Each structure stands twice: as structure tokens, then as C-alpha cells.
């Protein structure tokens, strides 16, 4: 004899094939339909008997590993081996769209920009620097470290200086001071995802630094 089971979400059908033909198994719950949700000690299904109901048993054995997502849903865990030579161009390709967006928001052209300074971990990726250089048609600078960026209140990895820093020496109380006139415009994260990564960028203009 051969037993065949047709598993549905709430119901299933069990049939036995013998030499005389195929017989669909009947049961006490219904004539020939067997619930896919099994309630222990009760005929009620999952809607009215959640505590004692076993459901989804047909999905216990899976050819992949499930992963709980931050929003509470269930995802599939995937492992992928990618060479840096393949991944870097893909990552670099995601740099240009936000740059275009903020340039449009600021109503600026490439020729309006004198210097480009980028900070952050992504500046170590050659493909990212190459994409930024190609977009602005200018060499970029990475001399500004993260601590200095925080001290200058840089809110995002990509910053744009309209004018180069102007250094002038002033003698005040016999002490030489260096005054930098920075007029900066920034690309700032307008919204962040659960991982702290920007999902939408916004162009803002900051006030001039006090002298």
C-alpha cells in the first residue's frame, strides 16, 4: 500500500492506494478532510484553541536556516562568498544616486564646488573614492579624521566646502591666532534604519562658524 498526503494550510487529505483503488481516509472530525492544525484534547482549531494547537508542523524540516528579523518577521539566513573585486564596484555604484539627489536639492553644479573632503570608514574603500572623484570631476581629500569632523560638527561622511579654508593671522594681545572661515554645506541623514544607517539623505546649509 502507498499512503499519500495532501497538506494544505488548515486541512489535509490522506489517501491510501491499494490494489483495489485509492481510498481517502475518513475521520471523526469530518467525513474525509483532516485538519492540518492538530488540537490536543480538543477538536477546536487554532482560532479558538491556540494554546493546545500544533500548527505548521509540515514546515519543521527545511532545507534552509531561518533568521528572526529586527521587525519580528522571519527571514532566510544566507551565506555568500564574494570577492572584493566583485563587491567593491557594486558598493561604489550605490554612491552616485545620493550625491545626485543632494546636488539637485541644493541646486548646485559641479563647477560650484572648490574642494571635496570625505570622512568615515567608507573612505578606505578604493571604489567609493573612485566614484566620488568621478562624480565631482575633482580630486578628493581624506585629511580630515573622524575626531576632527565631530569637533567641527560634521554630521555626515560626505561634506562639501564651498570655499577653501582661508587662514589669516591676527595679532591680538601679542598672541598670534589663526582664524578659519568655513562656509560648509552638508549632506545629512534625514532618516535612519534600525542599524543606524542612513536611508534618506537631505541637503542642509549651516550657518557660518563664529570668528
Curated annotation (Swiss-Prot):
Q: What gene does the UniProt entry assign to this protein?
A: HSPA4L
Q: Which UniProt keywords apply?
A: ATP-binding, Chaperone, Cytoplasm, Nucleotide-binding, Nucleus, Phosphoprotein, Stress response
Q: Does the keyword Nucleus apply?
A: yes
- Species for this entry: Mesocricetus auratus (Golden hamster)
Q: Name one GO molecular function term.
A: ATP binding
Q: Which domain of life is it from?
A: Eukaryota
Under the heading PANTHER family, the entry gives: HEAT SHOCK 70 KDA PROTEIN 4L, HSC70CB, ISOFORM G-RELATED
Q: Where in this protein does the record say Phosphoserine is found?
A: 161
Please explain the role this protein plays, according to its UniProt record.
Possesses chaperone activity in vitro where it inhibits aggregation of citrate synthase.
Major location (coarse): cytoplasm
Pfam families per UniProt: HSP70
- Location in the cell: Cytoplasm; Nucleus
Q: To which protein family does this belong?
A: Belongs to the heat shock protein 70 family.
Q: This protein is called what?
A: Heat shock 70 kDa protein 4L
Amino acid at each position: 500500500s502507498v499512503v499519500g498526503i495532501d497538506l494544505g494550510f488548515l486541512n489535509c487529505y490522506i489517501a491510501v492506494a491499494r490494489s483495489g483503488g485509492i481510498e481517502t481516509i475518513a475521520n471523526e472530525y469530518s467525513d474525509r478532510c483532516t485538519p492540518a492544525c492538530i488540537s490536543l484534547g480538543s477538536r477546536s482549531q487554532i482560532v479558538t484553541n491556540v494554546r493546545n494547537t500544533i500548527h505548521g508542523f509540515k514546515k519543521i524540516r527545511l532545507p534552509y536556516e531561518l533568521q528572526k528579523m529586527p521587525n519580528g518577521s522571519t527571514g532566510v539566513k544566507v551565506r555568500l562568498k564574494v570577492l572584493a573585486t566583485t563587491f567593491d564596484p557594486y558598493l561604489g555604484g550605490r554612491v552616485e544616486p545620493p550625491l545626485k539627489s543632494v546636488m539637485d536639492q541644493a541646486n548646485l553644479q559641479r563647477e560650484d564646488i572648490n574642494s571635496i573632503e570625505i570622512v568615515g570608514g567608507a573612505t578606505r574603500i578604493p571604489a567609493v573614492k573612485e566614484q566620488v572623484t568621478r562624480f565631482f570631476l575633482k580630486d578628493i581629500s581624506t585629511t580630515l579624521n573622524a575626531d576632527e569632523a565631530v569637533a567641527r560638527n560634521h554630521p555626515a561622511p560626505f561634506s562639501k566646502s564651498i570655499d577653501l579654508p582661508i587662514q589669516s593671522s591676527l595679532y591680538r594681545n601679542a598672541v598670534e591666532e589663526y582664524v578659519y572661515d568655513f562656509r560648509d554645506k552638508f549632506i545629512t541623514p534625514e532618516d535612519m534604519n534600525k542599524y543606524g544607517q542612513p536611508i534618506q539623505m537631505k541637503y542642509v546649509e549651516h550657518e557660518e562658524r563664529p570668528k
